[in-house]
Amino acid sequence: MPEHPPLQLDPRQRAMLAEMGVRVWLPEDAAPIPQEPALAYAAPAPAAAQIASKAAPVRAAPAPSVAAPAASQPAFNPGPRPQVQTLDWPALTQAAATCQACSMCQGRKNTVLHAPAVVGQTADWLVVGEAPDEEEDRQGAAFVGDAGVLLDNMLAALGLKRLALQGQGAEPESAPTEPAHSAYLSHALQCRPPAGRSPQLADVAVCRAYLEREIALVRPKVILAMGRLAALAVLSDQPALLAQPMGKQRGTLHRFQGIPVVITYSPYYLLRNSAEKAKAWLDLNLAADALASA
């Protein structure tokens, strides 16, 4: 893979990257080794009182109680697969909110699929995450909390901001944003997985119909797939690629229906692994270069 030339960043971009913890060209400082706290030792117990001459009577131990068997959960009967190929935004968001085509719907509060605040608004960038967490499920929005702040900073360093969506504090009559400076944010899965339930390939396949319709409506010129589930949803027709570790999937261009696709790490992963932020920044620049040369 060809090496990228040194990044040409102005002072504002460097300040933005420093704020989110990205050190361009410099390795991340090694994390300090936490000092293990000294073990607290208990004081010796006082000497036992004089032993009584007569032993206390021995009582039989009570028989262990047997827990009643847990009631079995009723089997989930999935509904029909979503048929959303021709839906407009209002119908698409309603279909996602009421979808019961897989068991991901069992514990959700909200889906994260929303229409742009301005009817017909498009965006040159589409950013796809993995699955909603608890806070995203509560708010009904993709990329919130610290991970959302990190992603917003990364996008801002490229002169981008997330597209305002309905139901997220934006009024429908808000002024449109230039598509070249906008990023539409979504997830591979629209529902938060129920507790103790990991997403399966079949779940991603069900939700892919929504993602493909979002792509058709947003009309992005470049797609950033952040995380394994995102890559699986966007590039499901490339199993050999998806079988490779993330380190080999990223750093190069892929295609979805002719649209450039760049795979990179999820912002949630980057919060736990700061040393990978510089690689993610290179991936964003790769996507920006692909868009500029399109």
Language model: regions and residue ranges:
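A polyanion-binding, active-site-adjacent surface
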Residues: P2-A294
